Amino acid sequence: MLELNFSQTLGNHCLTINETLPANGITAIFGVSGAGKTSLINAISGLTRPQKGRIVLNGRVLNDAEKGICLTPEKRRVGYVFQDARLFPHYKVRGNLRYGMAKSMVDQFDKLVALLGIEPLLDRLPGSLSGGEKQRVAIGRALLTAPELLLLDEPLASLDIPRKRELLPYLQRLTREINIPMLYVSHSLDEILHLADRVMVLENGQVKAFGALEEVWGSSVMNPWLPKEQQSSILKVTVLEHHPHYAMTALALGDQHLWVNKLDEPLQAALRIRIQASDVSLVLQPPQQTSIRNVLRAKVVNSYDDNGQVEVELEVGGKTLWARISPWARDELVIKPGLWLYAQIKSVSITA
């Protein structure tokens, strides 16, 4: 568990945090440049020192301004991966990985190298590596110090799109197989969507929202970030069944289900899906003999006018689903809170 209750002033910027983060999964730190994202992880790592408050990691006090406690970075057991890999140019990859390696991680070296796909790189110098390869090595080096927490400061920001696509699967694999909590700084919605379990949104040094990805994603805090055509819902589902005759998989959503193209996943596997609001249409009665496979009973929570369109907030199985319709459709269907209807879903994207 990471307890953050501190304030810090750097120049004209003030950062104030009072949150407790669980010791598992990935928490994305999201916001515009200057929001306080890097300042937050620098304070946690010990690169800067808050003027007030405390930082406590798994019961160990890293910083207590009142008591004058401020552990040096090397004593905090916190790994840090920067935007630029910062590898030692005169060491080969193997030497970079072993630099600072904890004794407890010696037996894990080969496993971690395989997990990150860097075994073919061990005898190469950093100067011969691509940006994505350098970042994989930097992540491996940080993990081999046996940290209790891993901080990643926009590790994909300096990479072009092909290199980002190269690195994302390795990060996803790490989240599944390495039980180390991570704070992932980013201003990329795509990275957050594919990696994060939770999101903390910072604005001018203040926390505007903090919670599970699917909750924060559907909140008003995220509206300025989402292009109108990309308003969407994030839902947690589980694999219910694979169709015996068609290449389709059913995903459980409360007591209902969604059909998607067949997935290579076992039954009961947990997944996250994304549904664009523009791919959801509404009807008052269940349609007969329709080509749309996904028709879910839903309850209207509210509706909002938005630049000539209407965003309708629905509840399906205790989860939030958004639909975008025209004002004409809203008036004709008499959309209002409490109305039960049916949501027809044309397309579903699997995100994690």
Swiss-Prot record:
Residue positions binding ATP: 31-38
GO terms for MF: ABC-type molybdate transporter activity; ATP binding; ATP hydrolysis activity
SMART domains: AAA
Localisation per UniProt entry: Cell inner membrane
Membrane topology: Peripheral membrane protein
EC top class, as a word: translocase
Protein name: Molybdenum import ATP-binding protein ModC
SUPFAM superfamilies assigned to the protein according to its UniProt record, in alphabetical order: MOP-like, P-loop containing nucleoside triphosphate hydrolases
Domain Mop stretches: 289-352
One GO cellular component term noted in the UniProt record for this chain: plasma membrane
Domain ABC transporter, residue spans: 1-229
Function: Part of the ABC transporter complex ModABC involved in molybdenum import. Responsible for energy coupling to the transport system.
Record's catalysed reaction(s): molybdate(out) + ATP + H2O = molybdate(in) + ADP + phosphate + H(+)
